Amino acid sequence: MTCQTYNLFVLSVIMIYYGHTASSLNLVQLQDDIDKLKADFNSSHSDVADGGPIIVEKLKNWTERNEKRIILSQIVSMYLEMLENTDKSKPHIKHISEELYTLKNNLNDGTKKVKDIMDLAKLQMNDLRIHRKAANDLFSVLQKLVDPPSSKRKRSQCLRRCSC
């Protein structure tokens, strides 16, 4: 399977995994549309396989459902951006775009989380002002790492109090 085929396979997985039930998603039509999209991009070209998949590989490190929602929201946005630069008058492109927009609406929280991660990566950790602020935050960060989530804690406290 070529890199482009892998990427379009990921697109199919995203569409199935989030926001759609079997009755609301016509997989046969979607696969046909993706095949037409592959033809539009000439994805059978020999250079597509060079270096392996570019999107599927990124998904391997994201294991939890909430983690996957973050990365998948970015992937959906990438596909929408890719389709913005194509001929939107073609029915198959319009259909894929509509499905992706629906998925994007279901994954809208991921963009904010990715922005937070990028903002953290941009912090100048050699800046004394950043050091001061980070030192003030350190105990709170460590507490969040040590303390169980409040919902689990509340449930376990309730079970201890209950004399069932």
From Swiss-Prot:
Gene3D superfamilies named in the record: 1.20.1250.10
Keyword Secreted among UniProt keywords: yes
The organism's place on the tree of life at top rank: Eukaryota
Keywords: Antiviral defense, Cytokine, Glycoprotein, Growth regulation, Secreted, Signal
Glycosylation-annotated residues: 42, 61
Gene Ontology MF term list: cytokine activity; type II interferon receptor binding
InterPro entries per the UniProt record, alphabetical: 4_helix_cytokine-like_core, Interferon_gamma
Compartments, record wording: Secreted
An annotated GO cellular component: extracellular space
Single Gene Ontology BP annotation: response to interleukin-18
The keyword Glycoprotein appears for this protein: yes
A Pfam family per the record: IFN-gamma
Signal peptide span: 1-19
Family named by the database record: Belongs to the type II (or gamma) interferon family.
Functional note: Produced by lymphocytes activated by specific antigens or mitogens. IFN-gamma, in addition to having antiviral activity, has important immunoregulatory functions. It is a potent activator of macrophages, it has antiproliferative effects on transformed cells and it can potentiate the antiviral and antitumor effects of the type I interferons.
Quaternary structure, from the entry: Homodimer.
Protein's name in the database: Interferon gamma
Organism: Coturnix japonica (Japanese quail)
